[in-house]
């Protein structure tokens, strides 16, 4: 233990002596550990029991779609699991298990630290991975979890990589604000490098937090008590960094002035970055502005109004490098927050959501934090899962005939080795992956096989699943199987995350957790209605995703739409998903891989389906439950099979009425070829699935998707970049 303590003078402690604690100190520790932790209001109730599918489109796959909760993750030694709620409250905010480290929590130990181990400030996080977690300053916090110490950023200052969040009192409203601040900071900073703690009022006064704080975030709406204000100013004078979020906290001669006309309204903000460039975005105003004060630091933001009201100020403080960035716009609030008053305000704020994160990252970087993207996650093994038990024996027999003696199926891009179990020694690369065939070895907090089964109501599609938590791209997983698999064993690859997601042409597809990611294998006879019109496949898949959501009872008005040729949109405003189709003709059959990705639970950086549901509930007083990716993948595959069958039976006329019901282009005016090209009006799709437009001179022309990109915001059709 001695050689694991780092001293200011670079020496190593030679000996640590044990100390007999006095009875009063022991009693104080006992009281601290017995404190009851207050959690936030309980989360959404579990979704109702799954219902069987009904009809063709109306209730395709009515399983347990309405469940937002995730399953538990493995528990870390010595700490509560980071992603597992410890009570009925919100994850990450309601754990009564506190792992206390005496050197921070006990006054006698602090005394001992000063006298016996002089100058010891901190223990090396890299060398002591199994020490109990330090919860100084978080007693009574709503479920703060023990931080993961391994891999934390090494700071030149020697301070622990802690970001402390102060929201004032322990009221329910304050705890809700704590959750919002935690959420947005987690989206912005390198979460492998920092740990976020709730700094309580008592702890702010009592505990030695300032020596172990890289950034203090003040997000209290109430006036800061004078004694706590004094602590915060002392921290700044020692070189501390402060971020104020819609708080009355101020310094350096600035005064916060109330402007009721601005309160909870959407305003246009001009933000000046450190390099002098400007970012313009829509923001939610707190109703306060900054006045007076000295010249500003590198960053500043003002409203685009006549007074150019100061909303973001950067204030250097003291001689040791202290500084604060103070904001009176709600950078911490998502567009769907309760303070956002109208659907139009929600739309405007969502359109600026990427820029909101850009501004916040610029501020955090200026305050010395890293906002670098986290490292690419390691690839994980594939799991072979079967949606129907009757598929088990035929598929395993087929597999036995097509693997070599080592259980390997090779293709030009990928080798799959089918094994009964996975060991950590097995190599996983984008070109070589193990496939675990024992279903008992499978578990995932992001994918429920039972939920998928309940919502899959197909006769052939999506029956055999290759599942991965992390893979390079689902588009390559089926490469060695697609030309050999029997058609009745519909194959689908599903992933939680992709490291090299693919879009059209050279485009990449971002694939964060919360996105429904899949590649489906479909066989289409050449001499069939759809075989003669293969471009329609991408339209059918986009339509299937929209119908998968809007055919659920109660969800009919969720404003999810299709955008030609291959996109899924929220209204005509923001992209929520997309489709990529690769087809190969062999003999009389098209072998088609349909890649599809759409945002279900990942609100940032743009928008997701559950955002639309939450906003719908707020505007209509409804109580619709959030949806799950596993449910919607199964429902979309179910709807797609029915759309294909209808198309094969009736041709385009069998599906176009539903497509036009949901598409965003009806009667839209566009220009052809370039911004100066002839004007035309969109009239529909032609017999092959290409876009048709009516020109001013009376002619109708067809526009091909692989030659043009559709720019919804400018109403233009322009050549696609090669």
From Swiss-Prot:
Cellular component terms per the entry's GO annotation: chromatin; cytoplasm; cytosol; mitochondrion; nuclear lamina; nuclear matrix
GO molecular function terms attached to this record: ATP binding; biotin binding; biotin--[biotin carboxyl-carrier protein] ligase activity; enzyme binding; identical protein binding
Catalytically driven reaction(s): apo-[methylmalonyl-CoA:pyruvate carboxytransferase] + biotin + ATP = holo-[methylmalonyl-CoA:pyruvate carboxytransferase] + AMP + diphosphate + H(+); apo-[propionyl-CoA:carbon-dioxide ligase (ADP-forming)] + biotin + ATP = holo-[propionyl-CoA:carbon-dioxide ligase (ADP-forming)] + AMP + diphosphate + H(+); apo-[3-methylcrotonoyl-CoA:carbon-dioxide ligase (ADP-forming)] + biotin + ATP = holo-[3-methylcrotonoyl-CoA:carbon-dioxide ligase (ADP-forming)] + AMP + diphosphate + H(+); biotin + L-lysyl-[protein] + ATP = N(6)-biotinyl-L-lysyl-[protein] + AMP + diphosphate + H(+)
Key words of the record: ATP-binding, Cytoplasm, Ligase, Mitochondrion, Multifunctional enzyme, Nucleotide-binding, Phosphoprotein
One protein family per Pfam: BPL_LplA_LipB
InterPro entries the UniProt entry points to: aa-tRNA-synth_II/BPL/LPL, Biotin_CoA_COase_ligase, BPL_C, BPL_LPL_catalytic
Comp. bias intervals (Low complexity): 46-55
Segments for region (Disordered): 27-93
Modification Phosphoserine, positions: 295
EC number: 6.3.4.-, 6.3.4.9, 6.3.4.10, 6.3.4.11
Keyword Cytoplasm included in the entry's annotation: yes
GO biological process: biotin metabolic process; protein modification process; response to biotin
Chain ranges of the BPL/LPL catalytic domain: 459-648
Subcellular location(s) per record: Cytoplasm; Mitochondrion
NCBIfam families found in the cross-reference section: birA_ligase
Function: Biotin--protein ligase catalyzing the biotinylation of the 4 biotin-dependent carboxylases acetyl-CoA-carboxylase, pyruvate carboxylase, propionyl-CoA carboxylase, and methylcrotonyl-CoA carboxylase.
PANTHER family, per the entry: BIOTIN PROTEIN LIGASE, BIOTIN--PROTEIN LIGASE
Family assignment from sequence similarity: Belongs to the biotin--protein ligase family.
Assembly, per entry: Monomer.
Protein name as annotated: Biotin--protein ligase
């Amino acid at each position: 233990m001695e050689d694991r303590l780092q001293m200011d003078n670079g020496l190593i402690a030679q000996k640590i002596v044990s100390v007999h604690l006095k009875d009063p100190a022991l009693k104080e520790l006992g009281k601290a550990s017995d404190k009851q932790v207050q959690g936030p209001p309980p989360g959404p109730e579990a979704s109702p029991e799954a219902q069987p599918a009904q009809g063709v489109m109306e209730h395709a796959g009515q399983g347990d779609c309405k469940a937002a909760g995730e399953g538990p993750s493995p528990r870390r030694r010595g700490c509560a699991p980071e992603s597992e709620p410890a009570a009925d409250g919100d994850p990450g905010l309601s754990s009564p298990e506190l792992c206390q480290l005496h050197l921070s929590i006990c006054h006698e130990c602090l005394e001992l630290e000063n006298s016996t181990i002089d100058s010891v400030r901190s223990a090396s996080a890299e060398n002591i991975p199994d020490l109990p977690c330090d919860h100084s300053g978080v007693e009574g916090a709503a479920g703060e979890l023990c931080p993961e110490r391994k891999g934390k950023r090494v700071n030149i200052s020697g301070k622990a990589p802690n970001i402390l969040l102060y929201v004032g009192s322990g009221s329910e409203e304050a705890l809700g604000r704590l959750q919002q601040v935690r959420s947005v900071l987690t989206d912005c900073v390198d979460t492998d490098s920092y740990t976020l703690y709730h700094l309580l009022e008592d702890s702010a006064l009592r505990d030695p937090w300032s020596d172990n704080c890289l950034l203090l975030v003040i997000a209290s709406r109430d006036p800061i008590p004078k004694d706590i204000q004094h602590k915060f100013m002392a921290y700044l004078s020692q070189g501390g960094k402060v971020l104020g979020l819609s708080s009355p906290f101020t310094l350096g001669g600035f005064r916060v002035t109330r402007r009721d006309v601005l309160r909870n309204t959407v305003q246009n903000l001009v933000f000046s970055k450190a390099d002098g460039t400007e970012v313009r975005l829509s923001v939610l105003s707190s109703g306060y502005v900054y006045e007076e004060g000295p010249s500003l630091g590198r960053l500043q933001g003002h409203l685009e109004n006549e007074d150019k009201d100061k909303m973001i100020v950067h204030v250097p403080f003291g001689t040791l490098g202290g500084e604060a960035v103070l904001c009176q716009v709600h950078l911490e609030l998502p567009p769907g927050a309760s303070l956002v008053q109208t659907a139009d305000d929600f739309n405007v704020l969502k359109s600026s959501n990427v820029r909101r994160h850009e501004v916040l990252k610029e501020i955090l970087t200026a305050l010395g934090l890293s906002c670098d993207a986290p490292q690419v996650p390691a690839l994980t093994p594939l799991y072979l899962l079967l949606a129907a038990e009757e598929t088990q024996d035929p598929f395993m027999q087929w597999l036995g005939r097509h693997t070599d003696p080592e259980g390997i199926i090779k293709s030009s891009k990928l080798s799959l080795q089918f094994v009964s179990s996975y060991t950590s020694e097995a190599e996983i690369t984008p070109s070589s992956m193990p496939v675990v065939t024992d279903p008992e070895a499978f578990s995932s907090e992001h994918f429920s096989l039972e939920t998928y089964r309940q919502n899959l109501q197909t006769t052939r599609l999506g029956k055999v699943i290759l599942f991965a938590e992390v893979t390079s791209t689902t588009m390559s997983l089926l490469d060695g199987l697609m030309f050999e698999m029997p058609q009745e064993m519909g194959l689908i690859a599903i992933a939680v995350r992709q490291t090299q997601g693919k879009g059209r042409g050279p485009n990449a597809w971002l694939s964060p957790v919360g996105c429904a990611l899949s590649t489906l294998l479909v066989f289409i006879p050449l001499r069939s209605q759809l075989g003669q019109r293969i471009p329609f496949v991408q339209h059918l898949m986009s339509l299937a995703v929209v119908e998968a959501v809007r055919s659920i009872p109660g969800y009919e008005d969720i404003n999810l739409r299709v955008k030609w040729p291959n996109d899924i949109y929220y209204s005509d405003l923001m992209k929520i998903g997309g489709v990529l189709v690769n087809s190969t003709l062999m003999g009389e059959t098209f072998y088609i891989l349909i890649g599809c990705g759409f945002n279900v639970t990942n609100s940032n950086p743009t928008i997701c389906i559950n955002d639309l549901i939450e906003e719908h509930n707020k505007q209509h007083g409804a109580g619709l439950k959030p949806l799950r990716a596993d449910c919607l993948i199964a429902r979309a595959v179910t709807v797609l099979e029915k759309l294909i069958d209808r198309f094969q039976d009736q041709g385009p006329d069998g599906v176009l009425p539903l497509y036009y019901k949901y598409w965003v282009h009806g009667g839209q005016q566009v220009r052809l070829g370039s911004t100066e090209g002839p004007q035309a009006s969109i009239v529909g799709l032609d017999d092959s699935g290409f876009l048709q437009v009516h020109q001013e001179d009376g002619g109708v022309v067809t526009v091909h998707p692989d030659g043009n990109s559709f720019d919804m915001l400018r109403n233009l059709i322009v050549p696609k970049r090669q």
